[in-house]
Amino acid sequence: MSSTHPGRTIRSGATQNLSGTIRPAADKSISHRSVIFGALAEGETHVKGMLEGEDVLRTITAFRTMGISIERCNEGEYRIQGQGLDGLKEPDDVLDMGNSGTAMRLLCGLLASQPFHSILTGDHSLRSRPMGRVVQPLTKMGARIRGRDGGRLAPLAIEGTELVPITYNSPIASAQVKSAIILAGLNTAGETTIIEPAVSRDHTERMLIAFGAEVTRDGNQVTIEGWPNLQGQEIEVPADISAAAFPMVAALITPGSDIILENVGMNPTRTGILDLLLAMGGNIQRLNEREVGGEPVADLQVRYSQLQGIEIDPTVVPRAIDEFPVFFVAAALAQGQTLVQGAEELRVKESDRITAMANGLKALGAIIEERPDGALITGNPDGLAGGASVDSFTDHRIAMSLLVAGLRCKESVLVQRCDNINTSFPSFSQLMNSLGFQLEDVSHG
């Protein structure tokens, strides 16, 4: 499918069934925010279960560059010595956020109000992703941000300045846009308000409240009071529902499967994928429901199910935006047709995820009609042909989704350019193989 150098190539093949218990990778969104708010708080923040993927490590490096002491105590355990809202120092180098759109957009908001100059950049993929959606509202607050294409593309040069509070009606439901404005509002006197067309994930609000900020939430509206007194916290990061979605779908589509996924974050702004899979007839049960650090958590038991095609309600899209690539796999192996609509945001992720999944699954024998805002997928419960080499477009979620599809292919599948799996799920192959996957790294052979 691609003449581009294949990079890390992984083979995936059919398996009899999946069984066992795993804890998926730690939540990436919460890990990023733990570092950010730990740095801005007074005193020490102790984090357990931090995701040590490349995206979060970039955030840690950025704050170390700005003078914050962040000590790695053990695997996933960090101590952050917060210096308060005005304690960051001007970085002596460009802040390279790698592949992380979350880190770049959130830091854009934070750095806009700092009394120094900074530059944010990233890899080729990140430099092609839209940044105007955060630059525009920040500019309304008085931010001075310059970038390519009129400030719409990174690298971004930020000349920190005193900001003014605003009320911003966001045209899209995006936690990254909302969080960038909230972070700018932290260092801004008065109340900053964001109104969204639908509720986006709320990890920023939950964590800020835990750190001591005054945050008011009313439906789709969030207001932050500037200059809060943030205090260091003890944080335990749950498993990421976005990471759990891969073994979840794998078990649902593989006959005889019965697995348990431990300690998965059940934040209601993130459980859209559960709603979609349950609507298809998925056998997913929540066990041991509890709350950890202000976030709902549960263990999930997932069993093979004869899935049925559904029509997506566009209002669920913001709550499942990162899980749609693997949802496409579930739809391709369901009975009947599935219509994905209202998901045009997928086109401006690490790749154009609609085209990437449509091309990849069609190469494996699936029937997919691409639409501007989604796709019409005609499922085949008997499985796919496979026997192809497909491109992940260096997108971690595309790579993992196509590897899941390989479980139900008659011939094994080669997925190219899988290197970026390390951004969100470094232990993916090891954990999936422990459940019964047949993943093999064939990069050198």
UniProtKB/Swiss-Prot annotation:
InterPro entries reported for this sequence: Enolpyruvate_Tfrase_dom, Enolpyruvate_Tfrase_sf, EPSP_synthase, EPSP_synthase_CS, RNA3'P_cycl/enolpyr_Trfase_a/b
GO MF term set: 3-phosphoshikimate 1-carboxyvinyltransferase activity
Domain of life: Bacteria
Keyword vocabulary terms for this entry: Amino-acid biosynthesis, Aromatic amino acid biosynthesis, Cytoplasm, Transferase
Annotated residues for binding of 3-phosphoshikimate: K28, S29, R33, S174, Q176, D322, K349
Keyword Cytoplasm among record annotations: yes
Matches recorded under CDD domains: EPSP_synthase
Documented EC number(s): 2.5.1.19
Listed PROSITE patterns: EPSP_SYNTHASE_1, EPSP_SYNTHASE_2
A GO CC annotation given for this chain: cytoplasm
Region annotation (Disordered) ranges: 1-24
Residue numbers annotated as active site: D322 (proton acceptor)
Cellular localisation: Cytoplasm
Amino acids binding phosphoenolpyruvate: K28, G101, R129, Q176, R353, R397
Keyword Cytoplasm: yes
Compositionally biased spans, kind Polar residues: 1-20
Catalytic activity: 3-phosphoshikimate + phosphoenolpyruvate = 5-O-(1-carboxyvinyl)-3-phosphoshikimate + phosphate
GO biological process: amino acid biosynthetic process; aromatic amino acid family biosynthetic process; chorismate biosynthetic process
Pathways per UniProt: Metabolic intermediate biosynthesis; chorismate biosynthesis; chorismate from D-erythrose 4-phosphate and phosphoenolpyruvate: step 6/7
Subunit structure: Monomer.
Family: Belongs to the EPSP synthase family.
Listed PANTHER family: AROM/DEHYDROQUINATE SYNTHASE (PTHR21090), PENTAFUNCTIONAL AROM POLYPEPTIDE (PTHR21090:SF5)
Described function: Catalyzes the transfer of the enolpyruvyl moiety of phosphoenolpyruvate (PEP) to the 5-hydroxyl of shikimate-3-phosphate (S3P) to produce enolpyruvyl shikimate-3-phosphate and inorganic phosphate.
Name listed for the protein in its UniProt record: 3-phosphoshikimate 1-carboxyvinyltransferase
Native species: Magnetococcus marinus (strain ATCC BAA-1437 / JCM 17883 / MC-1)
Gene that encodes it: aroA
